[in-house]
Structures are given as C-alpha cells and as structure tokens.
C-alpha cells in the first residue's frame, strides 16, 4: 500500500507505484534494455530510501534533489533533456506539455488521492493527455511506444494545451515575455 501524506514519508519500495515486486522491477529493467531506454526516477522529497541494489539494474537509476543540487543541476534542466515523462498528479506534467513529448500518468492511487488531497478538476483524467499507467504491462507499453517513435496522445496534448497554458498570440514565447515584462 502506498501512503501519501504531507506529514509522512511516501513508501514506494520499488520506486514506481505501478510496480508491485522486485521481480517486476527487474522485468521493467530488461524491457528498458531491449528498448534502448534509460529510466531516471526522480524521488519525491518525502519518499523513503532506495532499499534495493541499484547496481543490479542496467537501465534504471534514481536521483534525489540532493544529488541534483550537488551536481549543480536544476530539475527542469534534466526535464528538458527527457524523451518522455512519467508523473502522477504533479504540476510538472502540465509544464512538460509545453515540450510536446510523450507523457505517462501513474494512476494506481487515483481514488485515494481524490478522497484525501483532492484535485483542481472534477475529472482529472480528462486533463491527462498521456498513457494511463496502472501496472507493469502499462509501463512496458508506454516505453515501447517511445522506443519506436509512436506518440498516441500527441493530438490530445495539442487539444488540451490551450486549456493548460496561456499561449502567446505572437510568434514566440520570448517576445510575449518581453512584452509582458514591458522591456520591449
């Protein structure tokens, strides 16, 4: 069971809520290797420690905020380099939409989250333009699509983008920002 609370650590023994065993984590690692994909898991600040031997996995690594700080890297620098993003209900997924790259949403605790913390939207799934992930097979499907260049939610992202972001009416974001800051 995954516990999510501002007061408690988040317990994810296999680092992704969609995984239920070490065997599934190993199966995911094998699938990632076959797809030529390297998975970086950014741990939530409240998430408890990694209890497994990281060296046992060829295509899975995790990073913490502390590791990024020591390297002088901001999270969004890393995000800009990613070919895809898996998130839950975090605002980073909304920001990632601007890059127009594949998104996956881990929804294993959707009802629990709805009942405890709640959502901004009544039907949050309608605002998640990406693959819905509940288990290992869904994760494999998401990575398989990325590996072969398939993006089944591209049109849905484009349709939702104006609802999630104020888009500049002119040609570029820099020009719109300069006008907004009154420096042009």
Question: What is the predicted function of each stretch?
Answer:
Residues 1-56, 135, 166-169, 175:
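Conserved catalytic-core segment of nucleotide-activated headgroup transferases in glycan assembly
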Residues 14, 77, 137-141:
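An acidic, carboxylate-rich microenvironment
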Residues 33, 79-80, 144:
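Alpha-helix boundary recognition
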Residues 41-43, 87, 107:
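Short beta-strand/turn micro-motifs composed of small residues
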Residues 46-94:
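Donor nucleotide-activated moiety binding/catalytic core segment of transferases
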Residues 56-59, 64, 91-165:
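Catalytic binding pocket for nucleotide-activated donors in carbohydrate/polymer assembly enzymes
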Residues 142-149, 176-184:
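C-terminal alpha-helix
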